[in-house]
Design a protein with these regions (language model features):
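Intrinsically disordered, low-complexity Ser/Thr/Pro/Gly-rich regulatory segments
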Residues: 36, 69-70
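Intrinsically disordered, low-complexity regulatory segments in nuclear proteins
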Residues: 16-21, 74-81
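Acidic, low-complexity intrinsically disordered tails
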Residues: 8-43, 498
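Long, low-complexity segments enriched in small/aliphatic residues
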Residues: 227-297
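Short Lys/Arg-rich cationic patches that frequently serve as NLS/NoLS or arginine-rich RNA/DNA-binding motifs
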Residues: 1-11, 54-55, 60-63
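Conserved ATP-binding subdomain of kinase catalytic cores across diverse folds
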Residues: 50, 55-68, 78-99, 104-138, ...
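Charged, compositionally biased N-terminal leader segments and the immediate start
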Residues: 40-52
Length: 498
């Protein structure tokens, strides 16, 4: 991937300002292809790069063509498509009988609409100003896509946990989607406009603060950093008692969310004493024997994408049941399956999720990814491995019936910080923390010094993005109202009652 200055129409002079910043390229390697920042003009293994001070100065120069104040405010582009039409078009290719459920979940609130309408925001973001620095982005960075999960050492950590929309694009896209979600979650929780603005500014402040701490770190130290929620404490945003209580309760719940607990709650023994996953239509439904065989065949391909030692481990399990299981809001209608495997004795259960990976919502508005990443399951896996500080060792991908999938553990101490619990100090604490976590993800795959230099030490960017998030929150409320009252959407939702 050649250096992309994502501010559409950047001049040659502006582009020249980035000469000291490393390119974002994808290097094709036989044993695991990775995204990495480097300068393709030189051999980086033998040539030293620019100092972080010089790279930070380069970032500051970018303000000349993309002032930080330019990120403020929101006005719909005159050519903006009808958001309802975009959402309905995104139903194409999904499981038909699940589309009404998707529509119902999206109609629940403006925040739910934002979650499910990534295609709408992708179009909107593509018309916003950007600095010109691309990184591997999450692509769907909202408050409910941060969560708890376990490391291989069974330590519960907090990080980004959904990567279906990951791609290469402007770092601002992740930051703006996160701030819009904070604004809308605040509305759901009854926060005033002043309180929402404070929380959004905390997101950006956390992002800037984290970049400032990370941009001079040794590379290995940066990549080894992960966040233990009980130890979340920031210089500007101390851990208050209410936030500590929320963390404690959430972590306790996550620790109880493991394969052993799921085996007892989500499965039962049949008349022959064999484990079977409980059915709960339309969320969990039975599938045909033919489809089960296809899924098992896909698992064989998936295993080949794991590290060799993990391949050895997972082959000690055998499949005993497979069902279709609906997940999420925007993902409803994509094919997703829950697979129960049994290992060392019939109490040793392992639950895997095989989920269809569709094209990233931002894909139409960004340069095409290299051929090696045309497989959307592979794209999701590599994005997660790069952005997540401590990943799932059983994360892999496969193809089934011509469709790309990725596979991951269903329950490995997974949990959430429920957004509905947050108000006052906890809302601001987690807003700051999520901004900081996003910055760390971007620092792993981009040039933190250049981005930090652009963002700066003042609140200029914070104020601008706060203006944007509030205005975009208003826009999303309007879009949600149009969606919830649309006759076609209402007709689809009504099918759930018949």
């Amino acid at each position: 991937v050649k250096k992309r200055h994502a501010h559409r129409g950047m001049s040659a002079a502006d582009a020249a300002a980035l000469q000291g910043a490393p390119e974002l390229i994808v290097e094709n390697l036989e044993d695991g292809k990775i995204f990495e920042p480097r300068d393709t003009e030189v051999d980086t293994l033998t040539t030293p790069g620019e100092s972080w001070e010089k790279r930070a100065a380069t970032g500051k120069q970018l303000r000349e063509h993309a002032p930080r104040s330019a990120h403020g405010g929101w006005r719909p582009d005159p050519g903006r498509p009808d958001p309802v039409t975009l959402v309905l078009a995104s139903n194409k290719g999904r499981v038909a009988e699940l589309i009404p459920l998707r529509m119902k979940r999206m109609a629940a609130s403006p925040f739910a609409f934002l979650r499910g309408a990534a295609v709408v925001m992708a179009w909107d973001l593509s018309r916003t100003p950007v600095s010109g620095l691309d990184v591997v982005i999450d692509g769907d960075c909202h408050v409910d896509n941060f969560g708890l999960f376990g490391t291989p050492a069974e330590q519960v950590v907090l990080d980004l946990n959904d990567f279906d929309e990951t791609t290469i694009g402007p770092w601002e896209y992740d930051l703006k989607r996160l701030t819009a979600s904070v604004d809308l979650a605040g509305r759901d929780n009854g926060l005033s406009a002043k309180e929402r603005r404070k929380a959004v500014k905390d997101v950006v402040a956390g992002y800037r603060w984290s970049l400032d701490r990370l941009h001079s770190l040794p590379v290995l130290e940066l990549w080894n950093r992960h966040t233990v929620p009980e130890r979340m404490d920031h210089r500007q945003k101390k851990l208050d008692k209410k936030s500590a209580a929320i963390i404690r309760k959430s972590v306790e719940k996550a620790r109880a969310s493991n394969n052993a607990a799921l085996l007892q709650s989500a499965a039962m023994r049949n008349d022959d004493g064999q484990w079977r996953i409980k059915l709960d239509p339309p969320i969990t439904t039975a599938i045909s024997g033919h489809l089960k065989r296809d899924i098992i065949a896909g698992l064989h391909d998936y295993i080949e994408t794991l590290a060799p030692e993990r391949q050895f481990m997972i082959r000690r399990y055998h499949v005993v049941d497979v069902v279709r299981r609906v997940v999420g809001v925007g993902s409803v209608g994509l094919r997703a399956y829950l697979i129960l495997l049994i290992g060392n004795g019939d109490e040793d259960g392992l639950f895997l999720q095989m989920k269809e990976a569709g094209p990233a919502a931002l894909a139409p508005y960004l340069p095409v990814l290299p051929k090696a990443y045309k497989h959307d399951g592979q794209r999701v896996v590599y994005g997660q491995r790069l952005l997540q500080a401590a990943g799932d060792p059983l994360l892999g991908w496969c193809t089934m019936d011509g469709r790309p999938y990725y596979v991951r553990q269903m329950k490995n101490f997974k949990g959430a910080i429920p957004t509905e619990w947050l108000s006052g100090a906890p809302f601001n604490f987690f807003a700051f923390g999520y901004g900081a976590l996003l910055a760390r993800a971007h620092a792993r795959v981009g040039d933190a010094a250049v981005i930090s230099g652009y963002c700066g030490g003042s609140e200029t960017l914070d104020e601008a993005v706060a203006d944007w998030a509030e205005a975009y929150g208003d826009q999303t409320e309007q879009d949600h109202e149009s969606f919830a009252n649309d006759p076609d959407v209402k007709a689809l939702i009504a099918e759930l009652k018949t």
